[in-house]
Amino acid sequence: MSKKLSRADFLKSTAAGAAAMTIVPNNVMGAAFGHKAPSDKLNIAGIGIGGRGASVLKDLEKENIVALCDTDWAYSKHIFERYPKAKRFYDWREMYDKIGSEFDAIMCATADHTHAIIASEAMNLGKHVYCEKPLTHSVYESRLLTKLTEKTGVATQMGNQGSSAEGVETVCNWIWNGEIGEVTHVEAFTDRPIWPQGLMTPKETHVVPDTLKWDLFLGPAKFRPYNNVYQPWNWRGWWDFGTGALGDMACHVLHPAFKALNLGYPTKVQGS
């Protein structure tokens, strides 16, 4: 068996998504001394970097962060400063066009309604994709990405820090080992205080800040006048941009129950 593993070979063989982005091959020259050859690192472009994307990028710092893209440069200022050598963009399409040959993978943590288009275009370019939850804005988009993954053969992963945390596995093991007895009822809730829920669409129009490209944030969504209530978090409460509290938090609070109890699709859903 050959002990040589180039970056190209690594990319062709990997199927572990973003987890693969942090793998350090043992056979890299000097690996025993903690050295990793520059040619063996992945070049990563971050899209949607001010919020959750900032945390994801910090976990990828063993690789090369070569490009950063966000529609709100004021909100992303701390990340631009953290990676001063990375090229900066407002528009992910411009980034793909200008430096698509300079990166191997993307990290996408934009507003929900733009996940599918950003990820699909990256996959069509042969780029590996790590996309934050919710994977897409609709089931239809998710099915399209699934087919595209099979077609392109790139490594993909949906990011969900809640399901990746140690606590979920611990609770699952308790249940699987019978340590708390038979589970017959589960209650889950969220008040999601980081953004107020049930907001009405604002009627007032505000001046768009110079550091924000509102048209680029809207992307495929229907145009609406800018109001500062939407940024940087509250867009989640409008279907044009987000998926509401259910799409934002259910994957965190319900996932442990679904995994531990091996639940299937719901048979009944009630809303009020």
Q: Where in the sequence are the language-model features?
A:
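Flexible glycine/proline-enriched surface loops and loop-helix/loop-strand junctions
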Residues: 152-154, 198-201, 234-243
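N-terminal Rossmann-like dinucleotide-binding module
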Residues: 17-83, 162-165, 257
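N-terminal secretory signal peptides and thylakoid transit peptides that target proteins
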Residues: 1-18
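NAD(P)-dependent dehydrogenases' Rossmann-like dinucleotide-binding region
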Residues: 48, 179-197, 212-227, 267-272
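N-terminal Rossmann-like NAD(P) cofactor-binding module of classical short-chain dehydrogenase/reductase
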Residues: 106-107
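Basic phosphate/pyrophosphate-binding loop/patch that engages nucleotide-derived ligands
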Residues: 147-154, 172-184, 200, 205-208
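Rossmann-like dinucleotide-binding domain that binds NAD(P)(H)
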Residues: 215-272
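Beta-strand-loop-alpha-helix segment that lines the small-molecule cofactor/substrate pocket
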Residues: 111-112, 116-164, 178
